[in-house]
């Protein structure tokens, strides 16, 4: 793995000279190997080690290199065709493979090759970009978007129209991360490498980026780039120092309790694949 990392790093430094026609076969093979590893979950752009998230930047660089290496191709899709550099993840799947991997994919969900989809996940008509990692038991609801290299935990619900930001454009240092057992409400956006920690509930219509103030009304503490574990967050405003206007903020109104869990709990009936 270390030798592969070093080769990817070296190729990335020379990326300006790389095109689909000039790329060395060995570089193409290395990038294809990384994409395959991301696709199966053998590798992931970020992982939690000893309670801290670590980003493997070289894997992200391989994803970026793929856009320099692979040429556009015609892609079949339902009643139409597409033209893109990245093939679709399920292009060569048959019924046996869908059943083996225990996932449901509702048309016209679009999932790019190089993204990982865990068992007992449900993909409604949604979009998952390459490099993303969607863990087991998660629901990606209608018109939700999982951006490039985003990390989605186990038993997460991404409600209708949710946007989870990617890292490729604009280029971000770290991926957006939604930890296990989180609920993201309809039309909310979490971007710019923000981490929503385990068990949190984001109400609908909440927008969180790195510069968004995340205000805990119980303690008065303000967080940036991180929603503490078990938080219930709604959209709100905080007054300016001069008191003449207010600016948008995400407000932590309480910690998740049994009443909250009852409202946003996972419906196991919807996760049955067999």
Swiss-Prot record:
The keyword Iron does not apply. It comes from the Bacteria. Substrate binds at residues 104, 141. Keywords: Acyltransferase, Amino-acid biosynthesis, Cytoplasm, Diaminopimelate biosynthesis, Lysine biosynthesis, Repeat, Transferase. GO terms for biological process: diaminopimelate biosynthetic process; lysine biosynthetic process via diaminopimelate. Its EC number is 2.3.1.117. It is found in: Cytoplasm. It catalyses: (S)-2,3,4,5-tetrahydrodipicolinate + succinyl-CoA + H2O = (S)-2-succinylamino-6-oxoheptanedioate + CoA. Pathway: Amino-acid biosynthesis; L-lysine biosynthesis via DAP pathway; LL-2,6-diaminopimelate from (S)-tetrahydrodipicolinate (succinylase route): step 1/3. InterPro entries: DapD_Trfase_Hexpep_rpt_fam, Hexapep, Hexapep_transf_CS, THP_succinylTrfase_dom1, THP_succinylTrfase_N_sf, Trimer_LpxA-like_sf. Belongs to the transferase hexapeptide repeat family. Homotrimer. This is 2,3,4,5-tetrahydropyridine-2,6-dicarboxylate N-succinyltransferase. It comes from Shewanella halifaxensis (strain HAW-EB4). The lineage of its organism: Bacteria, Pseudomonadati, Pseudomonadota, Gammaproteobacteria, Alteromonadales.
């Amino acid at each position: 793995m270390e030798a592969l990392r070093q080769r990817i790093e070296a190729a990335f430094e020379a990326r300006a000279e790389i095109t689909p026609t000039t790329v060395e076969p060995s570089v193409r093979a290395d990038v294809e190997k990384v994409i395959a590893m991301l696709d199966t979950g053998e590798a992931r752009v970020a992982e939690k080690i000893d309670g801290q998230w670590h980003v493997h930047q070289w894997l992200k660089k391989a994803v970026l290199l793929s856009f320099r290496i692979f040429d556009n191709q015609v892609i079949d899709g339902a009643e139409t065709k597409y033209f893109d550099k990245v093939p679709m993840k399920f292009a060569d799947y048959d019924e046996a493979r869908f059943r083996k991997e225990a996932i449901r994919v509702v048309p016209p969900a679009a999932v790019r090759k190089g993204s990982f989809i865990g068992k007992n996940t449900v993909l409604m008509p949604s979009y998952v970009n390459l490099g993303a990692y969607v863990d087991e038991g998660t629901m990606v609801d209608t018109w939700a978007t999982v951006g490039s290299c985003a990390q989605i935990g186990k038993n997460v619900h991404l409600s209708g129209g949710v946007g989870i930001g990617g890292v490729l454009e604009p280029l971000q240092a770290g991926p957006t991360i939604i930890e296990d057992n989180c609920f993201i409400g309809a039309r909310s956006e979490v971007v710019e490498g923000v981490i929503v920690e385990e068990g949190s509930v984001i109400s609908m219509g909440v927008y969180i980026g790195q510069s968004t103030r995340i205000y805990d009304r119980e303690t008065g503490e303000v967080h940036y780039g991180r929603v503490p574990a078990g938080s219930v967050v709604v959209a709100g405003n905080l007054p300016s120092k001069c008191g003449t206007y207010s600016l948008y903020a995400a407000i932590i109104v309480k910690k998740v309790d049994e009443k909250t869990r009852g409202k946003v709990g996972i419906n196991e009936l919807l996760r049955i694949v067999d």
